[in-house]
């Protein structure tokens, strides 16, 4: 017997701390008996061939974070993910399942919500009933080439027959970097710069003399000899996130329903000057989700199931976010030396030099703002009519689905002047102060309609069963 050892590495960029108002314990779940919606049918997990992993929605329900699928990291064998920056509103991850089988750039598994391809990044975990991963060709074969890199199936919650049940959940959490890099201060930077200079040219005159190094160390004149920890000045130690959810479910023999609403707010990752503007320049965001489904039974033979999800999300960022240095804001925090220039000059002007003309205070507070908004609706209707009166086990089933989203992007930018303190006490200016303007906006609309109809037959013969 061959044994294979799979080593998985998971990189976590943030720690989250949540204090639930009311603790709830989930009942044990037999994953093999759970039903998953495949391409054209519902089937118990134990009857799905191939490499399959199952996780209940209750296991990730109380895991903080705006992207709930990130909570799957370390919980399902063979699944890994990475995030390019983790900033609020930009924390969508890329997922990878073991055994990628494509040479194209897109090697991510497809994601289906209730059997329909959709965006799961902002799906609220309280609406998730279960998640199933199909990880090999045998399991994902029915999806053809689209399933070459695996399939993530998400089943959302449905109403249950009985009295009305109302549930409300609220949480407040804080995220923080697991570890911040420790950088050289101005004094250490000067020492090592001189050492590197002498290594290259032993006869060279050091750039930083003893008096300058001592001024950096003592902090005697922070405007002439700056020692700015850009990371501590502009990157928050803790980032606040709040989430509220309410859901209502119930029903009887003729109708079963489930309705939920969720609101998520992320305060932003940077320290901004709230007195500098009347508008928000932080990388904050909020998401509002509404989800509802109804199952109607018209007599013994006709069943209708409708589902609709609506989402409204908004992301905010500095105006320079649309420019190169805006996108590389974190990189600039980590690449600007402590002694490059002070944040502000002694006269209150924004500091800068000929070598460093991207003052982080100016980028965050005086470059304008940008707003990205998306409104989306995803809906479908399933109709099933039982033909058992004529052929036992035969039914006709159909589905029609509609997806639409509208993106609206607004960018209002302005420029700011920076001033460098010269040796004679004067200032040299770089750039100009401008008024905020309408530098760009666009609107994008996407619509998709899909439908299918077919016959289905199910039957049992002795110890055999047929479902086609």
Where is each model-derived feature located?
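Short loop/turn motifs that connect adjacent beta-strands in outer-membrane beta-barrel proteins
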Residues: 159-164, 253-254, 269, 301, ...
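Flexible, surface-exposed loop regions and adjacent strand-edge segments
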Residues: 183-190, 275-281, 321-333, 411-423, ...
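Membrane-embedded beta-strand positions of outer-membrane beta-barrel proteins
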Residues: 166-170, 259, 306, 381, ...
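Carboxylate/His-rich catalytic cores and anion/metal-binding grooves
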Residues: 405-413, 440-468
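Transmembrane beta-barrel domains of bacterial outer-membrane proteins
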Residues: 291, 298, 393-403
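Flexible loop and strand-edge segments within Gram-negative outer membrane beta-barrel domains
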Residues: 177-179, 223-262, 266-270, 281-358, ...
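Short, small/polar-rich motifs associated with maturation and membrane association
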Residues: 1-290, 304
């Amino acid at each position: 017997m061959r044994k294979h050892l799979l080593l998985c590495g998971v990189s976590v960029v943030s720690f989250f701390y949540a204090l639930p108002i009311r603790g709830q314990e989930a009942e044990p779940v037999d994953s093999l008996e759970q039903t998953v919606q495949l391409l054209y049918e519902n089937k118990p997990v134990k009857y799905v061939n191939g490499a399959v992993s199952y996780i209940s929605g209750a296991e990730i329900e109380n895991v903080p974070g705006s992207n709930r699928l990130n909570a799957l990291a370390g919980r399902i064998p063979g699944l890994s993910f990475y995030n390019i920056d983790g900033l609020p509103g930009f924390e969508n991850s890329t997922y990878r399942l073991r055994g990628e089988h494509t040479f194209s750039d897109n090697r991510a598994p497809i994601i289906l919500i209730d059997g329909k391809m959709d965006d799961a990044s902002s799906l609220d975990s309280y609406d998730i009933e279960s998640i199933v991963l199909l990880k090999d060709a045998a399991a994902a074969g029915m999806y053809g080439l689209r399933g070459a890199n695996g399939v993530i199936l998400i089943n959302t919650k449905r109403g249950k027959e009985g009295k009305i049940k109302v549930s409300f959940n609220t949480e407040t959490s804080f995220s923080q970097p697991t570890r911040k890099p420790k950088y050289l201060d101005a004094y250490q930077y000067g020492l090592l710069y001189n050492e590197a200079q002498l290594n290259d040219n032993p006869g060279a005159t050091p750039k930083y003399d003893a008096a300058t190094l001592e001024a950096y160390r003592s902090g005697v004149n922070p405007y002439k000899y700056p020692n700015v920890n850009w990371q501590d000045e502009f990157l928050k130690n803790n980032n606040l996130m709040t989430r509220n959810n309410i859901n209502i479910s119930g029903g009887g023999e003729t109708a079963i329903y489930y309705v939920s609403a969720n609101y998520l707010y992320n305060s932003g990752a940077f320290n901004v000057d709230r007195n500098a503007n009347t508008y928000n320049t932080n990388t904050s965001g909020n998401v509002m989700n509404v989800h509802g489904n109804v199952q109607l039974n018209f007599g013994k033979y006709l069943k209708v199931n409708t589902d609709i999800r609506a989402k409204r999300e908004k992301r905010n960022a500095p105006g320079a976010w649309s420019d190169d240095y805006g996108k590389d804001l974190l990189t600039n925090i980590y690449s600007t030396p402590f002694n490059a220039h002070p944040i502000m000059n002694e006269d209150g002007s924004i500091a800068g030099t000929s070598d460093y003309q991207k003052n982080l205070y100016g980028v965050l507070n005086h470059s304008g703002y940008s707003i990205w908004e998306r409104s989306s609706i995803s809906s479908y209707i399933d109709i099933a009519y039982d033909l058992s009166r004529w052929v036992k086990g035969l039914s006709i089933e159909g589905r029609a689905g509609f997806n639409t989203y509208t993106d609206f992007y607004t960018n209002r930018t302005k420029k700011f002047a920076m001033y460098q303190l010269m040796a004679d006490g004067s200032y040299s200016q770089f750039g100009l102060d401008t008024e905020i303007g309408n530098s760009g906006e666009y609107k994008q609309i996407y619509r998709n309609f899909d439908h299918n109809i077919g016959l289905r037959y199910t039957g049992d013969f002795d110890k055999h069963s047929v479902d086609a």
